[in-house]
């Protein structure tokens, strides 16, 4: 994927860039794999804001992605198209299986239109093929990795993401995550060979607030710029330090967003930042 920079014809375009979409081969999605997608504006069923900075944005339709690929073992599929997906940073690939079925998958880096892919324990180790971890050699770069056998891909699904299979220990595979965390996963879990494509997406400069609003992102306002009724840091005559440690609008200390004592924590061999206090 290439990035095209705009000429500074306006203040909004001066610092902005856009993807050239050179890998995209079709602009119209497969109608049978579309589902309606309603907007929540970050609210729950009671109308209370549960996720800040969300709302508005262009209307979208959800593309149904096959994250399991376990019911098509041994059936060869041809990559019909590489398409854009507004619901994720990665591109998606439309597969035409030999039995006539069509499905979307996350498009790996280097997967081209017309390529053949396959899933199952006997599939070759090549980009786009989906296999159980026990059948993938150590040192292989993988993505779309399951956490539980048959649960569907949960890890390394965004643009440019990849996981390295370090080795196998009994009934577990040892993985190096994109965050440098090392964790164990059941060796029966599936993964797709290669890394997720569209890796240049991180280099796009949005240039103006309006482009973020098109994506459904609302402004992030500092607590110190609010009134006391809206935030613990709000109010004061002029600019003040707040006199306390940074907190959320509900008074919770900033940082430490990972929930401690998760059942899956016992599978972590080395944390992302081993020297940081938990």
Swiss-Prot record:
Q: Which Pfam families match?
A: Ribosomal_L2, Ribosomal_L2_C
Q: Which superkingdom?
A: Bacteria
Q: Which Gene3D superfamilies match?
A: 2.30.30.30, Nucleic acid-binding proteins, Ribosomal protein L2, domain 3
What the protein does comes down to:
One of the primary rRNA binding proteins. Required for association of the 30S and 50S subunits to form the 70S ribosome, for tRNA binding and peptide bond formation. It has been suggested to have peptidyltransferase activity; this is somewhat controversial. Makes several contacts with the 16S rRNA in the 70S ribosome.
Keyword Disulfide bond, does the record have it? no
**What GO terms are given for molecular function?**
rRNA binding; structural constituent of ribosome; transferase activity
* Keywords carried by this UniProt record: Ribonucleoprotein, Ribosomal protein, RNA-binding, rRNA-binding
Spans of biased composition, class Polar residues? Answer: 16-27
Q: What taxonomic ancestry is recorded? A: Bacteria, Bacillati, Actinomycetota, Actinomycetes, Mycobacteriales
| Protein name per its UniProtKB record | Large ribosomal subunit protein uL2
Q: Which organism is it from?
A: Corynebacterium urealyticum (strain ATCC 43042 / DSM 7109)
The residues forming the signal peptide are none
**Which positions form S-S bridges?**
none
Give the multimer and partner information.
Part of the 50S ribosomal subunit. Forms a bridge to the 30S subunit in the 70S ribosome.
Biological process (GO) annotations held by this record are:
cytoplasmic translation
Q: PROSITE patterns in the record, alphabetically?
A: RIBOSOMAL_L2
Similarity remark:
Belongs to the universal ribosomal protein uL2 family.
Kindly indicate whether the keyword Membrane belongs to this entry.
Answer: no
Q: Which InterPro entries match?
A: NA-bd_OB-fold, Rib_uL2_dom2, Ribosomal_uL2, Ribosomal_uL2_bac/org-type, Ribosomal_uL2_C, Ribosomal_uL2_CS, Ribosomal_uL2_dom3, Ribosomal_uL2_RNA-bd_dom
Renumbered residue ranges of the record's region Disordered: 1-59, 222-278
Entries under HAMAP family matching the protein: Ribosomal_uL2_B
Recorded GO cellular component terms are: large ribosomal subunit
Q: Where is the composition biased (Basic residues)?
A: 45-59, 269-278
């Amino acid at each position: 994927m290439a990035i095209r920079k705009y000429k500074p014809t306006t203040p909004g375009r001066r610092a902005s860039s856009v993807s050239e979409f050179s890998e995209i081969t079709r602009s119209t999605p497969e109608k049978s794999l579309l589902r309606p997608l309603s907007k929540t504006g970050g609210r729950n069923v009671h109308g209370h804001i549960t996720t800040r900075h969300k709302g508005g944005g262009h209307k979208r339709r959800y593309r149904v992605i096959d994250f399991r690929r376990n019911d098509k073992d041994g059936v060869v599929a041809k990559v019909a198209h590489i398409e854009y997906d507004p619901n994720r940073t990665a591109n998606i690939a439309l597969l035409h299986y030999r039995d006539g079925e069509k499905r979307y998958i996350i498009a790996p880096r280097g997967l081209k239109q017309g390529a053949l892919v396959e899933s199952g324990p006997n599939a070759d180790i090549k980009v786009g093929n989906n296999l159980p971890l026990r059948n993938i050699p150590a040192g292989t770069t993988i993505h779309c990795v399951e956490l539980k056998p048959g649960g569907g891909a949960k890890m390394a699904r965004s643009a440019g993401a990849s996981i390295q299979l370090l080795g196998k220990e009994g009934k577990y595979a040892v993985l190096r995550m994109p965050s440098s965390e090392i964790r164990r996963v059941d060796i029966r879990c599936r993964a797709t060979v290669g890394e997720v494509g569209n890796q240049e997406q991180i280099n796009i400069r949005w240039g103006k607030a309006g482009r973020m609003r098109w994506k459904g992102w609302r402004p992030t306002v500092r607590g110190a710029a609010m009134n006391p009724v809206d935030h613990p840091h709000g109010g004061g005559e002029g600019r003040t330090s707040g006199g306390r440690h940074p907190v959320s609008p509900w008074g919770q200390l900033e940082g430490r967003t990972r929930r401690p004592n998760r059942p899956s924590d016992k599978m972590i061999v080395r944390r992302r930042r081993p020297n940081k206090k938990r």
